[in-house]
Regions:
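N-terminal cationic and glycine-rich segments that engage phosphates or anionic surfaces
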Residues: 1-103, 108-442
């Protein structure tokens, strides 16, 4: 009853209701674009392309585009070129002083960074669109192309580039006038769109003898446990207490209260998995071009093999430490605390505070990196346990982390709208308590 009442409260708030309707409308436009094929391609002959993109790297690309990749759609390249550009610009902000300065300039700097990201996205699209067209020609018969030659190539590159830019614009509109982060929501919708189809396929496989009903129930229970573990990973924090000095200005008293710095167990997010998979793509690509590849190369090109997943897990652990080190700055945190009259009880301000924060991050990053590596290779483990590759994608990796992260973020935004207007929220927070000052939010 409480949940039903909360849903009613959502639609009572005019601003929240308008934002939800706007978000759903944008999502509908995005989903409809999937069914608009590139001019010059016969949609009735796309069956072979769909079969080639049902699993593996192509399957991931198709899932992140919501199935548009296998439909030769105007949105076939999806939002991933923009994500790639965002990652590159973010890394530039770590390496080059000019971009570091932009990051510290507030709103004006953010606008410039966004503009550079858009320019880089167009550059990536100009390179990626012809590659996609080459793949189309390789997978489809010649009769699938009503138009061919230079005109088809140039027009398709322009349309694919415009399609991704339009999807970017839709995401920004959701962020500005809707609910949640628009780009993240578009990726999530693309993933969820494949879930019903892949689940029905898995049910069919099980019901036709491979494990039966019992096997299907075990799969669902295990998936539920994995989702709970991923929520703990995404939400897990170590809260560091910070005491602020008491100040009296006129007749008012400021400070004197204890607050907390929430240090996330998985501060690196999904980035280590993306970096590791990008590196592990090289053996797959090389093995694809080499006709007589060595046993070493063949072993590392098998996405579901032992060696591939072992190296992937090691890379994820290393990248988790690397990315956490460049995104979490204990020196800056200690300086900010000192400027605002704050200190950690029992720890001297300055260098001791930096060392204390650094030691905490090292301790919580270790289990976080191992759990992230486990989540990343779970789809391969699921495939080895006879789960179909299509459905196994939902057992972990970037797929599950994105789903859990975006859903929780969107629910928290809706929750904040409800609480601002004195309504009960959607979620009840719980805490797994550890030592003093250390909790894991659920």
């Amino acid at each position: 009853m409480r949940f039903i009442q909360t849903i009613k409260n959502i639609f009572k708030i005019e601003d929240l209701r308008a934002r939800l309707i706007y978000t759903l409308s944008i999502i509908l436009i995005y989903r409809l674009g999937k069914y608009v094929s590139l001019p010059g391609v016969d949609p009735s002959q796309l069956g072979q392309l769909k079969s080639q993109t049902s699993s593996g790297i192509m399957g991931l690309l198709d899932m992140f585009s919501g199935g548009a990749f296998s439909q030769a759609s105007i949105f076939a390249l999806g939002i991933m070129p923009y994500i790639s550009a965002s990652i590159v610009v973010q890394l530039l902000g770590i390496v080059f002083p000019y971009f570091q300065k932009l990051q510290k300039e507030g709103e004006s700097g953010r606008r410039k960074m966004n503009q550079y990201t858009r320019y880089l996205t167009v550059g990536i699209l100009i390179l990626q669109a012809p590659t996609y067209l080459v793949n189309l020609h390789a997978q489809l018969p010649a009769t699938a192309f009503v138009i061919s030659g230079t005109f088809f190539t140039i027009s398709s590159v322009i349309i694919l580039t415009a399609g991704t830019i339009f999807v970017m614009w839709l995401g920004e509109k959701i962020t500005d006038k809707g609910i949640g982060n628009g780009i993240s929501l578009i990726i999530m919708i693309g993933i969820i769109a494949r879930l019903p189809q892949n689940f029905v396929f898995e049910v069919g496989v099980r019901m036709n003898g491979a494990g039966g009903l019992i096997g299907l129930i075990v799969e669902i229970v295990f998936l539920f446990v994995v989702i709970l573990g991923t929520i703990l990973l995404v939400q897990g924090t170590r809260r560091v207490p910070v005491q602020y000095a008491r100040r009296i200005v006129g007749n008012k008293q400021y400070g004197g209260v204890r607050q907390y710095i929430p240090l996330k167990v998985n501060a690196a997010g999904v980035m280590p998995i993306i970096f590791a998979q990008a590196i592990m793509m090289l053996p797959v690509i090389i093995a694809g071009y080499a006709q007589n590849g060595s046993g070493f190369m063949v072993a590392f090109s098998n996405m579901y093999g032992f060696w591939y997943n072992l190296v992937t897990a090691i890379l994820i652990i290393l990248f988790t430490y690397f990315y956490t080190a460049i995104t979490i700055n204990p020196v800056q945190m200690a300086e900010d605390m000192k400027k605002n009259g704050g200190f950690i009880p029992g720890i001297k301000p300055g260098r001791k505070t930096v060392e204390f924060l650094d030691s905490i991050m090292s301790r919580i990053t270790l289990p976080g990196s191992f759990f992230l590596a486990i989540v990343a290779i779970l789809p391969s483990v699921a495939v080895q346990a006879t789960v179909s590759p299509q459905f196994a994608q939902f057992y972990g990796g970037t797929t599950l982390l994105i789903l859990v992260g975006v859903i929780l973020d969107t629910l928290q935004q809706i929750e904040s709208h409800l609480l601002m207007r004195h309504y009960d929220g959607l979620m009840k927070s719980g805490r797994v308590k550890g030592r003093s000052g250390a909790t894991t939010s659920i």
